Each structure stands twice: as structure tokens, then as C-alpha cells.
């Protein structure tokens, strides 16, 4: 046990929870604030300014006036004017009732030396509100946009995450993600012949198949013949000449032998 002298900061009733106050060269005591962890319990009535001795014992149990009906096993915290009340808030619970009590009666509280600490986003002090909203899982679109600004510095990536990429953004993103020049050319929709060959080799596609020319015995690709205008012949000889020109074009294209 350790004892020291303190002064009552206000009128204090016995069996109420107390807190420590410092004053010039003295220690003062008063009722503990609601929903805080108390430091002492009063065992006698005091008037404001009274000098008293505080005896500190190992924490075991306190007898305190109940603010409300309390059941054995209820977790308790500081109520109004230093009384004790039930609580489910583990951050403010300082013990648990080991006896029944009606409001205004004495209840025995076992002092818990282990406190469960729960930290919420609002407890994080100097933290951006958008980060707190994210941690609470209730971020708005505006919060999300600000978070992306916090997390991402690359403007093209930001544009992608914001769903507003321009063509320049897309090209820059492809340059960020892909190092192979042949694939980049393909993604940029401008591969030259050599690049096309490289890409086919990369995916195991080989050389494109070319249809053979059609013959009388072999099926092949259909070729286009040069355009021919309508014949303007007014006599048989000219008409035959135009027809022979058409036949020649068809032979060249492989339609006929």
C-alpha cells in the first residue's frame, strides 16, 4: 500500500468514482468524467477543500454507487457524477460487476487490469478525411478520386483509374506496361510487315497461307481482273476485239487458260 495527501476539488459523496487533478504543489480529486477510466473510489464524504489521505492498494474490487440496475457479470464504466453504469464499450470499461445492485445501491466491481483497445478511423487524429472514409468503407466518389490522387502520381494511371483516358493516355499506359516493341506496335495498331512477322513467330502462327492460283484442276483464290467499261462497238469487228480483250484479262487473272 502507498498513501499520499490530496484535496477535494468539490463536494464528494462516499463510494463514487474519482479522477486525479493537478494544482500548484498539490494533488486534487473530483468525480471521474463519464465514460473515462477512473483512478480512485471514495470511501467517505468530503467537502470541497477538505484534505484527505489517498491509500493505494493493489487493484482488486471497489464498492461503488450504481447509476442504474446492474447484473452480475455486466461490464461497467463511469456514469454520471462518479457513479457506475453498464457498458458495452470496451474502451471505457474498467471492470465488471460481481454482485447485483439496483440503481442507487452499492455494487461490487472487480477491477480489470486488462483493457481491450479498439481504435476506429476517427481516433487516428491528423489523418486525411478521405482516408478515414476509405477505412470506414463508405468512401464517396469524391473520396475515391482524392485517394487516387494520394496514392498514384502517374497522370496516365490516374486517368485510367478515373475512367477518362485520352488516346495519349492509352499510348503512354501501353508504353508503361509493355516493353516488347513488336507488341507495342500491334497495340498501337501500326505494325509494319516485319513486325507482323515477328508477332506471328512469337505466338507460333508461322507464315500466313497464300491460296494458289486457280487452274482447271486446282481450286485457288479468286483474282480480280482490271475494270472494263461497256463496249461501244457499232460493228462486229470492234465487238469481237473488245470481247478478245476481256478474254485476255481473264486468262491473266487465271480464270481461264
UniProtKB/Swiss-Prot annotation:
Pfam families: Phage_head_fibr (PF11133). InterPro entries: Phage_B103_Gp8. It comes from the Viruses. GO terms for biological process: symbiont entry into host cell; virion attachment to host cell. The keyword Manganese does not apply. GO terms for cellular component: virion component. The keyword Iron-sulfur does not apply. It is found in: Virion. Keywords: Host-virus interaction, Viral attachment to host cell, Virion, Virus entry into host cell. This is Head fiber protein.
Amino acid at each position: 500500500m502507498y498513501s499520499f495527501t490530496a484535496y477535494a476539488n468539490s463536494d464528494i459523496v462516499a463510494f463514487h468514482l474519482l479522477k486525479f487533478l493537478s494544482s500548484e504543489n498539490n494533488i486534487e480529486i473530483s468525480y471521474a468524467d463519464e465514460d473515462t477510466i477512473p483512478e480512485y473510489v471514495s470511501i467517505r464524504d468530503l467537502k470541497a477543500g477538505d484534505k484527505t489521505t489517498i491509500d493505494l492498494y493493489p487493484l482488486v474490487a471497489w464498492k461503488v454507487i450504481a447509476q442504474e440496475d446492474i447484473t452480475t457479470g455486466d461490464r461497467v464504466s463511469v456514469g454520471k457524477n462518479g457513479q457506475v453504469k453498464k457498458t458495452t464499450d470496451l474502451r471505457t470499461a474498467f471492470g465488471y460487476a460481481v454482485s447485483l445492485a439496483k440503481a442507487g445501491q452499492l455494487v461490487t466491481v472487480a477491477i480489470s487490469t486488462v483493457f481491450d483497445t479498439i481504435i476506429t478511423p476517427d481516433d487516428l487524429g491528423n489523418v486525411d478525411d478521405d482516408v478515414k472514409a476509405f477505412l470506414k468503407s463508405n468512401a464517396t466518389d469524391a473520396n475515391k478520386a482524392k485517394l487516387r490522387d494520394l496514392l498514384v502520381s502517374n497522370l496516365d494511371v490516374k486517368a485510367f483509374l478515373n475512367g477518362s483516358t485520352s488516346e495519349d493516355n492509352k499510348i503512354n499506359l501501353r508504353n508503361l506496361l509493355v516493353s516488347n516493341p513488336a507488341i507495342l506496335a500491334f497495340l498501337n495498331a501500326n505494325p509494319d510487315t516485319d513486325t507482323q512477322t515477328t508477332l506471328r513467330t512469337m505466338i507460333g502462327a508461322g507464315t500466313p497461307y497464300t491460296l494458289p492460283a486457280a487452274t482447271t484442276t486446282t481450286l485457288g483464290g479468286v483474282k480480280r481482273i482490271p475494270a472494263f467499261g461497256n463496249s461501244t462497238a457499232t460493228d462486229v469487228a470492234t465487238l469481237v476485239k473488245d470481247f478478245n480483250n476481256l478474254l485476255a484479262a481473264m486468262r491473266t487473272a487465271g480464270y481461264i487458260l
